[in-house]
């Protein structure tokens, strides 16, 4: 006997648009508030943006990262990140860890503080050898922030433009514009969350934002594809009703995908360690806001813009809409 887990019934009839554009306008207001928070409060930049000191530690003993971290907790340090370094060329008894330290108040890490760090690590691992120490001062870190932030903004902007072009070609320009509006609110609100709560913002969070964009567009394309299928077979029903049908038909898939993603992210947040916790936190919030924006932002924008109903209508140059054909060899 087979058992099937159903979080959502096969057939649902939820009217997602009974509140009109209120949820959409509320989302726009929240995105604007997030932008204002980033501009006024700012972000709690991590070592990737502010610079600091990187210490490379090698040992013949495989000491856990948690033991290194416990040893450094006794010292008054700024933001500290400890990661294991793996390389196929390492010997069987060669274990390398990288300790990255951001000094408090954005000042340069002193040699005395570096000495305290090395002494603390030698207590828990007498075999440890420090093979390299690199420091990025506060003057360089200011330039680093500008360059890194600009690169991150350009990366997100390029991904949004590419996604809009794809959806435009795959469907219609209204779908592409609606998708990009939803993706922008996803990214902006997520970044705003980090600004308001001053959670550490580093390159892993930039990666999380781009991952959220990918997760979100996947959900939107599924819904838009169902809308197009329904439009092809129904040319009389009002578009809002067809959109509700499409959202309900894909609701089970959306819920199951989101729930399984959240379960994995919760495990990463709890047991993944400090390095990946920020990524998991951003993804937990982003996976929920992505589904929300599909229904209450992207779909609503498409309704406001309207779409043509004659998907199968022939024109002088061929079928209407963007079509891709292949010929047999």
UniProtKB/Swiss-Prot annotation:
UniProt keyword terms in alphabetical order: Cell inner membrane, Cell membrane, Membrane, Protein transport, Translocation, Transmembrane, Transmembrane helix, Transport
Alphabetical GO biological process terms: intracellular protein transmembrane transport; protein targeting; protein transport by the Sec complex
Membrane-traversing stretches: 27-47, 149-169, 177-197, 204-224, 256-276, 279-299
Record-level Gene Ontology MF annotations: protein-transporting ATPase activity
Keyword Cell membrane: yes
Localization (cell): Cell inner membrane
Domain of life: Bacteria
Coiled coil: none
Cellular component GO terms, alphabetical: plasma membrane
Membrane topology of this protein: Multi-pass membrane protein
Family designation: Belongs to the SecD/SecF family. SecF subfamily.
Subunit structure: Forms a complex with SecD. Part of the essential Sec protein translocation apparatus which comprises SecA, SecYEG and auxiliary proteins SecDF-YajC and YidC.
Function text: Part of the Sec protein translocase complex. Interacts with the SecYEG preprotein conducting channel. SecDF uses the proton motive force (PMF) to complete protein translocation after the ATP-dependent function of SecA.
Family annotation (PANTHER family): PROTEIN TRANSLOCASE SUBUNIT SECF, PROTEIN-EXPORT MEMBRANE PROTEIN SEC
Protein name: Protein translocase subunit SecF
